[in-house]
Amino acid sequence: MARAPLDWIDRELEALEAKGLRRALEPLASPQGPVVEVGGRRLVNLCSNDYLGLAADPRLRSAAAEAAEREGAGSGASRLVAGDLPVHGALERAIAGHAGTEAALLFGSGYHANAGVPPALVGRDDAVFSDVLNHASIVDGCLLSRAKLVRYRHADVQELADLLAGTPARRKLVVTDAIFSMDGDAAPLREIAGLCDRHGAMLYVDEAHATGVLGPRGGGLAEALGVADRVDVHMGTLGKALGAAGAFVAGERRLVDLLVSRARTFVFTTAPAPAASAAALAALAIVEAEPERRARVLALAARMRVGLERLGFDVSRVAAPIFPVILGDEARAVAASRALRERGFFVRAIRPPTVPRGTSRLRVTLTAAHGEAQVDAFLGALEEVLRVPGGGAPRVL
């Protein structure tokens, strides 16, 4: 029976519906892949973060099944109690080796890592500097830290320099996404690292959308730019390019030792399931052994970039297989998503509050499992859905 104290929720849901902002789940009837079954139809999947096409890889499935048989379905407890299993340590050692750091620590998700690490590093007498377009989990972690939150304009190195110089604090922490998830552009990490060196600030880089994709060994943007040794906190996810689940923080041994004691999202949660960690361990080996996967997805991204620019979209700053097809208002983005589905493509509309009002978009992503023909077919379908009058801004028909 519905309880009266929750009646306010009905009004909230009605308001969300009226604004076109109410969200709903839509389950897949197939594993992740370049083509998925949704709503009884098989559609080309252009909204997954499975960048290397590993989520349904038989090697990951086998590793997960073997780990479940060997170590059980669940971990049963926090790692500080009775949930620290052999596969967790094996994965952490492999991550540290891949990242070139002394140690690494697993978290249940990227949100857990970003929400838990900043509060372990800074507090009331400190300041944390965050790009205005950082992921929501970073913002939440900064707020939970109770440090002074100083937000700087997106990728604005000069403003960050001024703020670092003009903000007194016991400790200073600069936090940035490596690749920004809604726009696909890269942070100016070389310049940010230089500012952190100059001001004695710690540097935290969220490589969620760069891990496995960028860099000679798939280490991320910091590796690609040659500044990995100047990053104090490397955060990456295991559920995007690596196709499994969970996240990690890599860095100096003393950093990890502190997080084991102070990161509440590590201490007060059940350890990751053995199957997920084993799948991630298998994926990491594939990332190192098969660089052609990175080359493949980046080549497809280059093809998509050319096609979108031909249609009038500015994607010149995109540095990863993430493309913002910005259409403006929410209704226009939703209409485009529906029209593309009718043409066989699964692309979700991204609306406020995920992106700023007036920038609703289609967020188009690619994986190494896609083909050139699928990219070209999508561009053709998008051209049908959009009209470009007189070379002006694209709009939905």
Curated annotation (Swiss-Prot):
It is an enzyme of class 2 (transferase). It catalyses: 6-carboxyhexanoyl-[ACP] + L-alanine + H(+) = (8S)-8-amino-7-oxononanoate + holo-[ACP] + CO2. Its cofactor is pyridoxal 5'-phosphate. It comes from the Bacteria. InterPro entries: Aminotrans_II_pyridoxalP_BS (IPR001917), Aminotransferase_I/II_large (IPR004839), AON_synthase_class-II (IPR050087), AONS_Archaea/Proteobacteria (IPR004723), AONS_Proteobacteria (IPR022834), PyrdxlP-dep_Trfase (IPR015424), PyrdxlP-dep_Trfase_major (IPR015421), PyrdxlP-dep_Trfase_small (IPR015422). Its EC number is 2.3.1.47. One of its GO terms (biological process) is biotin biosynthetic process. Keywords: Biotin biosynthesis, Pyridoxal phosphate, Transferase. Catalyzes the decarboxylative condensation of pimeloyl-[acyl-carrier protein] and L-alanine to produce 8-amino-7-oxononanoate (AON), [acyl-carrier protein], and carbon dioxide. This is 8-amino-7-oxononanoate synthase. It comes from Anaeromyxobacter sp. (strain Fw109-5). The gene is bioF.
